[in-house]
Amino acid sequence: MEIIIVGAGIAGLSAGSGMVALRKGSIIDGTNMQVLIPDYYKDSESKWGLPMYAVHRVDLHTQLRLLATQKEGPGQPCDVQVRSKVVSYDAEGAKVTTENGEVLRADLIIAADGVHSTAVKQVLGDEVVQAGDTGWACMRWLVPSDDFLSDPQTAHMIQDSTTRYFTAAGGAAALVWYPCRNNEVQNFLYLSNFRARVEPSVPLEYAKKHFATALQTVVKKANQVKFWKLVARGPIPKWHKDRLVLIGDAAHPMLTFQGQGGGQAIEDGAALGILLDNVHDRGEIEERLQLFEQIRRNRGSALQILSNTNPPVPQSVRDAAAEYLPGHRLSSTDDVNEYVFSFDVLAESKAALAILQSKERITKSGFL
């Protein structure tokens, strides 16, 4: 079966390396440095089978691309085409048109080209709701660990394999700080309602409004700051039409507060990889895509809602996600973490496919 994947981000590829295992993590009141929830990732390996990891996004993307294009392993390697922006989709004909007018056809089109993907219009028609400004924006920057270790004011704040999540008064801002590249680099994500042009001095200007002096000293080291507004969209009623399927931010764009945008994109790719294995007839595609939505749409939709606020997630938000959580009651932050991290997309996909194939064998045998 020939497949066109539009988009070569996390959703379009899948897997990772260059990671740091997180032994612990805390949620901290950034105004007074009081620890609100210690050991936020405590016992993750014993509970969910794997340790928590922090990874530089560039390293993750590099490894995903390597995995997708290498000749070793099952399946055919992907042929990655750059500078081939897709401007239109045809769900029924399973084809896309690039900005230079080239028309590409396949058995299946996977739209993984982000929150502004025009494929959403093809799937939903007049039902489509465009992603909009959430009022939130973020700044990101990296600082070499040596810059902190060589400064007496910050050396004591470097903690191996620790993620820290600092909150501001009233939820007005959040600062996420975690190590990557074997603790050689410190990665920062600063979230608030920023609207100013970002210069190296801007993070500190905002930090003076939001955080304690000790944290301002950390933010002062920001350089080469990247800035973007955060857009999102609520859950949508379906993710596929004919031979076109949405994954990643095209299907379920979400805010960053649960740190699940990339994780959910990888789950999408993992599920499709299993469900589309050994499909030899176009007539099988629709049933496999229905199974994909059965496994992924409620979960992706619930996490869109749960990602709308800083952790710990309030009960009102947990209740709002209940529509997409049949059989689950999220009564606490621990329940949210259990829901996020205990799900095994590989096992769920294999089990669902086995049931489908069993039914197909029974039908072919003439017993039904």
UniProtKB/Swiss-Prot annotation:
InterPro entries: FAD-bd, FAD-dep_Monooxygenase_BioMet, FAD/NAD-bd_sf
Residue ranges of coiled coil: none
Keywords linked to the UniProt accession: FAD, Flavoprotein, Monooxygenase, Oxidoreductase, Virulence
EC primary class: oxidoreductase
UniProt EC number: 1.-.-.-
Matches recorded under SUPFAM superfamilies: FAD/NAD(P)-binding domain
Subunit structure and binding partners: Monomer.
The family this protein is said to belong to: Belongs to the paxM FAD-dependent monooxygenase family.
Name of the protein this chain belongs to: FAD-dependent monooxygenase phomE
Organism of origin: Diaporthe leptostromiformis (Lupinosis disease fungus)
Lineage: Eukaryota, Fungi, Dikarya, Ascomycota, Pezizomycotina
